[in-house]
Amino acid sequence: MDRSGLLQARVPVDLTMQLPRQSNPTDLEDSVARSTCVYVTYIRTTPEKLWSALTDPEFTAQYWFGMRSESQWEAGSPWKLVTGEGEVLDSGEIVEFDPPRRLVIRWENQRNPELKAEGVSLCTMELEPHGMAVKLTVTHTIERDGSKLIVAVSGGWPKVVSNLKSLLETGSVVLQDYERKH
């Protein structure tokens, strides 16, 4: 909170290449290039309500521009993001399911051939109680330098999470339409 007592959202977006430390600088086979988008916000709600909002397909459609996030919601189960018309835009697998703290999805774009060719990314959603709010951290990573997918999601996550925050706090979304370019 700032001095005025208002909750503030911090929106860091990191599109830089990150290389793990190498024991031998000449051994490049052990290095992995990575692109990452991180979005952090604070939502005035409970961890349980936020968790439900992230995993209930009917609720996701309200803030995710009509798209439903569908799964059996257990580790190893398939996951997909589906339009109201039934088109699967993204799909993958639930890697980790730890309600109401951590959700990890192996994520692959199905709509755009160029983004699909980049392969599988990992989306991690972490929920942490913070006073009367919940800190939500969305981290989307792909093992690829200069990923166009990460550029795309770095434009999408702020819109989706802004709608989620607004819906949970006020009962309505702030953005009605979203032109998905990926």
Each model region followed by its residue ranges:
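A conserved amphipathic terminal alpha-helix motif
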Residues: 17-22, 142-182
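A short, structured loop/turn motif at beta-sheet edges
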Residues: 47-48, 95-101, 126-135
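Hydrophobic ligand-binding cavity/cleft-lining segments
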Residues: 13-70
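Short beta-edge strand/loop motif at the mouth of beta-sheet-based domains
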Residues: 38-39, 58-91, 177-182
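Hydrophobic pocket/interface hotspot
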Residues: 50-51, 60, 79, 94, ...
